[in-house]
C-alpha cells in the first residue's frame, strides 16, 4: 500500500489489486469487480512508472492482463500475466513426488486460461528426458507407480486445476 508516487520509476510493478475470490466462486465471476478496480488504478500507476515491467497476478489473471494491456497502452513486452505459472509448478511438484525425484527433472507445463479451462498436454510431459510413460514403465519403482493413464492423468489435472480453490476454503 502507499501512494502511486512510491512506485515512481520502478523497474517492476506487481499488480495484486482486486477483490479476493470467495469459496465456490470462479475466477471469471470475479471479472467485473476486478476489471473496475484495474480501470481505476492503471492510468495512475502507469503515469508514474511508464517504463516498468508489469506483472499481473490478480484474478482472473488472463482477463486482467488483457484489460491492463488495453487500458495502459503499454507494449506487450512490458506486461506479464502469471497465468498458469503457479499451476505448472503444482504439476511439476505432484509428478516429482509421484516419481520420487527432484522437480528439476520434471518437464511439464499447464496450458490455457488459468483455472477451469487449463489443461496438461501429456504427450509433451517428460521426466528426466524421457516421456512420462517411458520413464514410468522403465523405473525400478514401476510397481508402485503403475497407473491407468487416462484416470491418473485426469486426477492429476483436476488436482492442479482445483488446488488454488482449496487454499480459499
Model-found features: residue ranges?
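Short acidic low-complexity segments
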Residues: 1-9
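Short, internal active-site loops enriched in acidic
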Residues: 5-6, 60-62, 113-116
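N-terminal Rossmann-like NAD(P) cofactor-binding module of classical short-chain dehydrogenase/reductase
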Residues: 11-14
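Conserved NAD(P)H cofactor-binding loop of Rossmann-fold oxidoreductase domains
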Residues: 17-19
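N-terminal glycine-rich phosphate/adenylate-binding segment common to multiple enzyme folds
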Residues: 21-23
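Rossmann-like NAD(P)(H) cofactor-binding subdomain of soluble oxidoreductases
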Residues: 26-93
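C-terminal substrate-binding/catalytic lobe of Rossmann-fold NAD(P)-dependent dehydrogenases
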Residues: 72-78, 88-169
Amino acid at each position: 500500500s502507499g501512494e502511486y508516487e512510491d512506485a515512481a520509476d520502478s523497474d517492476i510493478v506487481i499488480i495484486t489489486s482486486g477483490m479476493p475470490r470467495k469459496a465456490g466462486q470462479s475466477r471469471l465471476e470475479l471479472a467485473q469487480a476486478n476489471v473496475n478496480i484495474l480501470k481505476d488504478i492503471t492510468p495512475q500507476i502507469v503515469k508514474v512508472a511508464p517504463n516498468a515491467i508489469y506483472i499481473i497476478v490478480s484474478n482472473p489473471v488472463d482477463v486482467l492482463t488483457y484489460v491492463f494491456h488495453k487500458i495502459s497502452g503499454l507494449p506487450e513486452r512490458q506486461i506479464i500475466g502469471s497465468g498458469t505459472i503457479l499451476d505448472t509448478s503444482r504439476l511439476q511438484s505432484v509428478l516429482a513426488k509421484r516419481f520420487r525425484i527432484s522437480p528439476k527433472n520434471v518437464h511439464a507445463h499447464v496450458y490455457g486460461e488459468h483455472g477451469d479451462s487449463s489443461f496438461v498436454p501429456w504427450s509433451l510431459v517428460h521426466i528426466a528426458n524421457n516421456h512420462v510413460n517411458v520413464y514410468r514403465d522403465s523405473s525400478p519403482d514401476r510397481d508402485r507407480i503403475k497407473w491407468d493413464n487416462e484416470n491418473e492423468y485426469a486426477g492429476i489435472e483436476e488436482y492442479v486445476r482445483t488446488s488454488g480453490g482449496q487454499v480459499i476454503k
